[in-house]
Amino acid sequence: MRWGVLICDDVGMNIASVDTPVGRLGLVEEDGAITQLLWNAQDSGERTDLLEEGCSQISAYFAGELDEFDLPMRVAGSDFQRAVCDAMLAIPLGETRTYGEIASTVGASAQAVGNACGCNPIPVIIPCHRVLGANNLGGFSGAGGVEMKVKLLRHEGAAGLLI
């Protein structure tokens, strides 16, 4: 594990990064909660127990030993964005939902759900990659775009849904 500190607008955020099969992923902790997952995070700084646990869970997920993350998280954004994140968290490993199915759950349009998925600050852990278009993969705002979405779905055993 590697550790880093990111300073943004005079607010210090602890970052721990871990190498994975899809690249280096960095977890951001603020005030005892995970607030972001960053792609290709930089290393340096202090270590916290929460970040150590988060990196351990990410490693276990990619080793096929973890189906569901158990970390305190705080999602910035509107009540609607948080509702979409909650709906994504309810999608089990190896399964997918469409933007329309999530829209029915949260009482919004599929396009609004897609926009909220694109603003997901904690991808992989909040599994926006499990949300697909009705007739296509939809998008993915993480590093690598839709190709990364496919890699994550294959890792989870949901690749058969892509054919």
Question: Model-predicted segments: where are they?
Answer:
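Basic nucleic-acid-binding alpha-helical/helix-turn surface characteristic of O6-alkylguanine DNA
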Residues: 2-108, 155-163
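Structural signal for hydrophobic
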Residues: 88, 128-129, 152
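Residue-level detection of the helix-turn-helix DNA-binding "recognition helix"
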Residues: 118
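Short Lys/Arg-enriched helix C-cap and helix-to-coil transition segments
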Residues: 125-133
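…primarily DNA-binding HTH/wHTH and HhH modules…
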Residues: 135-163
